């Protein structure tokens, strides 16, 4: 990460896409997409997804590392080219506890990530815990971030410190997109970004972390990008120029969250304006979902009724029976909630892919379609971009490859934005 940031600060147009997903097909796509390039791939886990207690994936940081490396071995991607990151490392999962208890768990969380070899660490202590004022004072956020940084430094080896990089900042959009309709978004003001940096510098120095400050590579800000279930707030470069000019006076870049669904031209503008780390998650699993739905429609027409997977019906039934991952985000009312379950840009389906019933139905669908020749006309109907690539000889009409290429469409836009 440090080399890439140094190149950006030296004037090169270069950035990196941060893949925030634990879905094996998304990780496989990210690695396979760059297999024949010289670029490194940044894959990040969030604190609620992967933590010392297992998170909602059931994986510790060490488990997640081995999970990613196993996929890399399968793809033929050198693990030395993988950068592992930890996102929102702090009290996020334990906000219902008092600050002392939550921070104690957060310290162990950060240590677990660093011990597992994660080298990009987002120190995020911005969330209020039980009994805390809402919002927290910037000084409190910075002091807690310094405690987390001290934890990271205490377990990092000398070799790890050479690679270790930190991201600070509190102005993060709702992880995974907004829960309600949006029309506009507040862009971070320069004075707020400057105050974030100033308070963190003071807190780090007070804890003897002056050297660790040199490892802070980025500040999280809101450049004016966001999405909800069916709306996208697109990047307006002219609105972010004050931010772009301010960061040029520092040795850092910006990290932009919720950049999903922007145009490839917007990604290029974001990187030009020093938002050099672009995080993406739901857009990748949304593309996966589109591919699975398309293949399910194809299966519906090609496979005998008694042999079909019933994939779409299974997904719908499981999500209606177990609504904990979407209920507080989606609209009420049967019809509206069904539309959101299927098509929301927030893509809460991503939490359900590991469910045994859904996993089994998708596997059945894939086996069914691997055993037949899919007519080109059907691929044109349901996956038109992939049809064009089959026609040009770039792609085969194999279900797995069709899913991969659908995810590649998202990665292609980021590559256009980030490539030197």
UniProtKB/Swiss-Prot annotation:
Task: Name its pathway.
Answer: Carbohydrate metabolism; D-tagatose 6-phosphate degradation; D-glyceraldehyde 3-phosphate and glycerone phosphate from D-tagatose 6-phosphate: step 2/2
Query: Per its UniProt entry, which superkingdom is the organism in?
Result: Bacteria
Q: Name one Pfam family in it.
A: GatZ_KbaZ-like
Example of a GO biological process term: D-tagatose 6-phosphate catabolic process
| A cellular component term, taken from the record's GO annotations | plasma membrane
Q: Which Gene3D superfamilies match?
A: Aldolase class I, putative tagatose 6-phosphate kinase domain like
Which family is this protein grouped under? Belongs to the GatZ/KbaZ family. GatZ subfamily.
How the protein assembles, per its UniProt entry? Forms a complex with GatY.
Q: What is this protein called?
A: D-tagatose-1,6-bisphosphate aldolase subunit GatZ
Organism of origin is Escherichia coli (strain SMS-3-5 / SECEC)
Please spell out the taxonomic lineage of the organism that makes this protein: Bacteria, Pseudomonadati, Pseudomonadota, Gammaproteobacteria, Enterobacterales
Q: Which gene encodes it?
A: gatZ
